[in-house]
Amino acid sequence: HRIARRQRQMCIRDRAKFTLPKVVDKFVKRYPNVHFQMHQCTPDESVEMAAKGEVDIALWTETTEKGENLVKMPCYKWSRSIIVPKGHPLASIPKIKLKDLSQYPIVTYVFGFTGSNDLDRAFFERGLKANVVFTATDADVIKTYVKMGTGVGIIASMAFNEEEDKDLISIPANHLFDSGTTYMGFRRGTYLRSHLFEFINMFAPHLTKKIVAKACATKSKKDLDKVFESIKLIRR
């Protein structure tokens, strides 16, 4: 009898819904004997569990100093959008400024989730304070509270769906906040079976077997960064 192998994947909620479904579907069809187990958690939890070897691969959305024993690989860039109900005053402003945004209560991600640290820093650097009244780990929850009128939402742009979110307006916020980066990582020294290489490449096509092997061979963060310095990441 063939023993099913297990791939333990850890990621945060929005990645599970907006970037992984097609990849997972393709993967499980190609490797029907590999049991795919996904955990949804915070970025810090992802990094910590990968560092302990409790999961094979982790995904997270913020630069972190944790997990020094991980091979950390950038996958793609992502942007933020402001979401408001139709008819909201912000929807009529040609180019929103942070000062405009600071006049309203804000609904966004929990601190440490999907680049919320960068959001706080953007306001601070301009001498402003974000009036965050509600936080959640899930973009769908944030959108629900925006529809209720609790506040203005700030979410990952990929989390907005024109078909499902017809009551809301999405306003690009690239000029207000730096782009975020989604990373993938695994514990240094992990033996990567062929199906793990395949999954990594399905999720981030620039992470070829050759590039991943180079990343694994590095001894320092500086060397690891050099592996990816000439690679232009796609934006989602």
Question: Which sequence ranges carry the predicted segments?
Answer:
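Single conserved hydrophobic/aromatic residue that forms the stacking wall/gate
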Residues: 1-8, 12
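Short alpha-helix C-terminal cap/hinge motif
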Residues: 9, 15-39, 48, 121-125
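Short beta-strand-centered segments that line the small-molecule binding cleft or hinge
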Residues: 22-26, 43-80, 84, 147-150, ...
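Short beta-strand-to-loop elements that line the ligand-binding cleft
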Residues: 34-41, 61, 129-138
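Beta-alpha-beta core module
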Residues: 67-79, 140-189, 198
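Flexible hinge/capping segments at coil-to-helix
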Residues: 69-106
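Short helix-loop capping/hinge motifs at secondary-structure junctions, enriched
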Residues: 87-97, 176-178, 189-194
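Secondary-structure junction motif
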Residues: 91, 105-126, 192-201, 207-220
